Amino acid sequence: MKTARAFTPAASDMIVDIADCMVLRQAILAALPLLRELVVAGGTRAGEMALTVTETGAGLDVAVTGGKPMDAALLPRLAALAERGDWARLTWAGPDQDGQSITRRPPVLGFGRARVVPPPGGFLQATPEGQAALLAAVRDITRGARSVLDLFAGCGTFSLPLAETARVHAVEGLSAPLDALAAGARAASPPLHRITTEVRDLARRPLLPDELTHDAIVIDPPRAGAEAQARQIALSRAETLAWVSCDPVTFARDARILADQGLSISRIYVIDQFRWSPHVETVAEIRRR
C-alpha cells in the first residue's frame, strides 16, 4: 500500500506528498516515518484515515480515526509502533468503534498550575506559544474579576489558569473535555478557586441573559462563531468580555450584534500563531458603553 504524508492545495481535494514541513514541532517531524508505518499497518484502500498528533511533556499523543477495526491481530502491531516511537498514548478508533487507547504514560498538558490529560484528538490551541499569548490577553482583560464564565471551554485552556484567582463556570458542548478539566482542577496544587462545569450545546441552547451574571465572560467559539450566544449576551447586563476568535469574518458579525446593544471593542490583540498562512487569532476586549 502506498502512503503519503501530505497536504491538500487550496480549493482542492488532491493529495500532495511532502518530505518536510516547516511548521511542525521537531518531535512530530521526527515521527513522520513511524506515522507512515502506522498508516500502512492500519489503513485500508477503501477508507480515509485522520491522525491528530500532539506534543506533550510525556511524549507524543497520537489519535487515529478511520482505520481498520481494532482486532487481536492489529493491537500488538500498534503497541509495537507506540513502543518504538516512545509515544505517550496511541488511540485507535476504527469504523463504528469507540477509541481504544494504548497509554504508556498519561499525555499531560499544563494549563496554569493545573495538569490535564486531554481526550484523544480533543481541541487544543495550535502551539504552546500561541496559547500563552492568548492566555496573557485573556488574563489582562479579566483582571480583577471574582467570577468568570468560560464559554466553549474545551478542557480548560482558560478556565484552569483563571481559577487561580476567580471562581469559574465552564460550559462546553462535549462531556469528555469537561471531565478532563474537572480532573485537572481536583489535582491542582495549591488548590484552585471553585470550578463548576456544564455540558451544553451553545449553538442550540445559548445561555440566556439571566444566566450571564458573572463579572467577566470569556468566549472562544469555533470558526463558525457564536451568533446565537452573541444575541443573548447583547440582551444581558454583561459588562466585560474577552472574545477569542480564529475567524475575523464571523467575529465581525458577532461583534456587530454586541455593538448594536451598547457593547464596544476597547482593545484588540492580534496573535499570529498560524505561521505562513492567512489565518489569524484575535482576542477582543469588549465592554458596555
What do the PLM-derived regions correspond to, one by one?
Residues D13-I18, L60-A63, P118:
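Short small-residue beta-strand/loop micro-motif enriched in glycine and branched aliphatics
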Residues A6, A50-T52, V108, R115:
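Short, surface-exposed charged micro-motifs
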Residues M1-E48:
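Extended interfacial segments that mediate partner engagement and assembly in macromolecular machines
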Residues P69-R289:
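Rossmann-like S-adenosyl-L-methionine
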Residues Q26-I28, L51-E55, L149-D150, C155:
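Feature of Fe-S/electron-transfer and energy-metabolism proteins
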Residues C21, A63-A72:
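A short interface-forming secondary-structure element
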Residues A46-E55, L90-T91:
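A short glycine-rich, hydrophobically flanked beta-strand micro-motif that places a catalytic Asp/Glu
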Residues M1-T3, A10-S12, T56-A58, P95-Q97, ...:
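Short acidic-glycine loop/turn motifs at beta-strand connectors
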